[in-house]
From Swiss-Prot:
Pfam families: Peptidase_C54
Coiled-coil intervals: none
Active site: 130, 305, 307
Record field: catalytic activity: [protein]-C-terminal L-amino acid-glycyl-phosphatidylethanolamide + H2O = [protein]-C-terminal L-amino acid-glycine + a 1,2-diacyl-sn-glycero-3-phosphoethanolamine
Domain of life according to the entry: Eukaryota
Protein's name according to its UniProt entry: Probable cysteine protease ATG4
One GO-annotated biological process of the protein: mitophagy
Native species: Pichia angusta
Molecular function GO terms recorded: cysteine-type endopeptidase activity; protein-phosphatidylethanolamide deconjugating activity
InterPro entries associated with the record: Papain-like_cys_pep_sf, Peptidase_C54, Peptidase_C54_cat
Length: 509
């Protein structure tokens, strides 16, 4: 009886969540990853839906009417995007001893929990894997564009071997190059994430970076990650240049465009990034959850929602049968359910509802593509953009580090450390773009020790005129600075590549 009630409740939630979204904007152009579509003429006025249909499945003619309100070519483009979602029933991901429990109220409601394995680990990512799934979607669509071109369209009646191969790299088994198992493993290695813990943009980006490098022979794709939004040409070229040409490289920018919401100052530039031909979408951008954003209309962003539990995407493992881990093997069908990674359901979110923490993806296929991207970035007003291109990292020389190790960083120019205290769900390494305009510097700075210095040095902290004052009352000036221990900075910040800042202001502008 209880099981039947849960299934009924799950069906109701699924119906409400899965309802078609009609087009109600016939003025603004539709944009999908660099392609634009006319909104089309408004349909005839329709009656409001009967609320009595709430507990009934959507009728085919109703779905057709909703679908008809969107331009056909726009729908074909959306339907061709690879859509990776929650899955259940995949090979076990072992639980960490001090990690989250696979059993939760949400998993019971969704009906995705496997009670037979719940004490051992996870066989579903429902409730915690949305950032992984949207990052997989971003990467999968990058590979789709790289191998099949932006004009390719999914056709259910025709089999495309390259498309099927790309999807097979993301199936839910440990041996697939970009499976959730490998993302979880790299999340632990790169960001200390335990199975069942929610990823942020930085953990997702670093996982993509490591996995793409490990599987470069398959993908032919390099990954450049910036946690500040700043792209340094010398580093990018060192990573991807081959002679006079540039090999394909995926630029990932882990950024935060506000404290609780996206600052309206960045709205225009955010939409422009989705309109560039190099755009492969945005992962993140919803409080305590993540979506894959692929386009916009007016001030609304279109997205694919990963919060739709489906049966695990499985194909036969290529691992040798003498593998010591029996969890690598499950009973699977020989075919690949390609239809389950595509949808034509349209969802959109207003920019003022978007979470400011996100991962922006840009695919550079060659040198001409990079030059065009650089021009697009530089043509926008610097005060309202969150991406910048520099020849190289600026340099700051220091006589002593006061005992800092080479891997430790000091962040200069933050208005108040309390800005970071307010960001509970901020992923490590993604906060450096916060309040860029009010900061003396926008990057973590590596301060190197001068080997010529004597052993006894002044290790005290000295503040310059740009140092942040936490107390505005001048009478309490002696209480205005907080002491920040190294252990605290390590727990709050995950350093990106070392950044050095020059006294020459022209180098940073």
């Amino acid at each position: 009886m209880a099981s039947h009630s849960l299934n009924t409740l799950h069906t109701v939630f699924e119906y409400i969540w899965d309802r078609e979204l009609p087009n109600d904007d016939f003025t603004n152009t539709l944009t999908v990853l660099g392609r634009t579509y006319a909104p089309g003429p408004p349909p005839h006025q329709e009656k409001a839906p009967d609320l009595r249909t709430l507990f009934h499945k959507f009728k085919p003619d109703q779905a057709a009417d909703t679908e008809a309100s969107w331009p056909r070519e726009f729908l074909r483009d959306v339907h061709s995007r690879i859509w990776l979602t929650y899955r259940s029933g995949f090979p076990l991901i072992k639980r960490a001893e001090d990690g989250p429990s696979p059993l939760s109220f949400g998993s019971l409601i969704r009906g995705t929990v496997d009670l037979a394995t719940v004490t051992k680990g996870f066989t579903t990512d429902a409730g915690w894997g949305c950032m992984i799934r949207t990052s997989q979607s971003l990467l999968a669509n990058s590979l789709l564009q790289l191998r099949l071109g932006r004009g390719w369209r999914y056709d259910q009646t025709r089999e495309c071997a390259k498309h099927a191969e790309i999807v097979s790299w993301f199936v839910d088994i440990p041996t697939a190059p970009f499976s959730i198992h490998n993302f979880v493993e790299q999340g632990a290695n790169c960001a200390g994430k335990k199975p069942g813990e929610w990823f942020g943009p930085s953990a997702a980006a670093r996982s993509i970076q490591v996995l793409c490098e490990a599987n470069y022979d398959k993908t032919g794709l390099k990954v450049y990650f910036t946690a500040s939004g700043d792209i340094y040409e010398d580093e990018l070229f060192e990573l991807a240049q081959q002679g006079a040409e540039l090999r394909p490289v995926l630029i990932l920018a882990g950024i935060r465009l506000g404290v609780k919401n996206v600052n309206p100052l960045y709205w225009d530039f955010l939409k422009k990034t989705l309109g560039w031909p190099q755009s492969v979408g945005i992962a993140g951008g919803r409080p305590s959850s993540s979506h894959y954003f692929f386009g916009f209309q007016g001030d609304y962003l279109f997205y694919l929602d990963p919060h739709v539990p489906q049966k695990a995407l499985l194909i036969a493992s290529e691992a040798p049968h003498e593998s010591p881990d029996p969890n690598h093997y499950v009973e699977v069908e020989s075919g690949l359910d390609l239809d389950s990674v595509h949808t034509n359901k349209i969802r959109k979110l207003h920019l003022d509802q978007m979470d400011p923490s996100m991962l922006v993806g840009l695919l550079v296929e060659n040198r001409a593509s990079y030059d065009a991207l650089k021009h697009s970035i530089n043509s926008h007003d610097q005060g309202s953009r969150f991406l910048n291109v520099y020849d190289s990292r600026p340099v700051l020389a220091a006589k002593s580090s006061g005992g800092l190790e080479e891997s430790e960083f000091v962040d200069l120019g933050v208005l108040s450390m309390n800005e970071y205290d307010a960001i509970d769900d901020c992923d490590v390494g993604t906060c450096s773009a916060l309040l860029r305009k009010e900061r003396a510097f926008s990057h973590p700075v590596l301060v190197a020790m001068d080997p010529e210095e004597p052993e006894e040095i002044d290790a005290s902290i000295h503040f310059d005129k740009d140092a942040s004052i936490l107390e505005k009352d001048p009478d309490r000036a002696n209480e205005t600075f907080e002491e920040i221990h190294v252990s605290e900075t390590e727990s709050r910040f995950e350093p990106d590549e070392p950044v050095v800042v020059s006294h020459d202001s022209a180098a940073v502008m």
